[in-house]
Swiss-Prot record:
Associates with the EF-Tu.GDP complex and induces the exchange of GDP to GTP. It remains bound to the aminoacyl-tRNA.EF-Tu.GTP complex up to the GTP hydrolysis stage on the ribosome. It holds the Pfam family EF_TS. This is Elongation factor Ts. CDD domains: UBA_EF-Ts. The gene is tsf.
Amino acid sequence: MAISASLVKQLRERTGSGMMECKKALVETDGDLDAAVELMRKKGLAKADKKSGRIAAEGIIAAKRSEDGHSGVLVEINSETDFVAKSDDFLAFADGVARLALEEKPEDLEALMACELNGQDLATATKELVAKIGENIQVRRFVRYGSSGNTVAQYLHGSRIGVMVELEGGDEQLARDVAMHVAASKPECVSEDDMPAEVIEKEKAILVEQARESGKPEEIIEKMVQGRLKKFINEQTLVGQPFVKDPDQTVGELLKGAGAKVARFVRYEVGEGKEKKEENFAEEVMAQARGS
């Protein structure tokens, strides 16, 4: 039977697929639009499964926070290209995933993928987006903070870096300032108490060996090591770092002056720890550095 251009257009609007694919599906289903949608869906999902093996190291960090400011989420959602990560379909999907993570309070990623988004579970919705966009899409990870009295603040830097801070005492502006600092300075933990003992001992052993090469007496070496170890700890901990907006004081001093304490923080960066083409990554980092 003859397939009208209007019918092809309707199928394209419903599936987001190409013109020739839509026309072929309509021919196979004798012009039955609903049957063609189902056929396209089946074929699309099959293609999506094949695409799921591709590296998805681009994407965005999405954030949502409750109206009372006591809970929030960060979610990393990956795509294969930055172009797709900026598309309306991808951004709407990411916003929906973040909303689910905040409202449904899933315990882990598996539970999140079972939550309902637009009438279907998130796992199926993800596959359908893969079929529509033509790239591997992955909901990689999420974190949720929630408390009855503490302030939760978030900071997003260009959608590629996301930070969430839970603050005891202080106010929302302070919490946001601390979140911005974490985005820029990348502390490993809040304070020395949170640093694994083996990390400190390993660094101390390295510093001792370096100091002994100076040939100085042991008591001098001990002082050298203690000074350098303190510097190392300050560089790694949030409270020991100079505050980015006022380097004359540390974050710890800033918090103390406000009668506040950071209960916890998390920092996400798109694609960290994932395989990525080296030349593209280097160019992107340089471009970000020039633009910041």
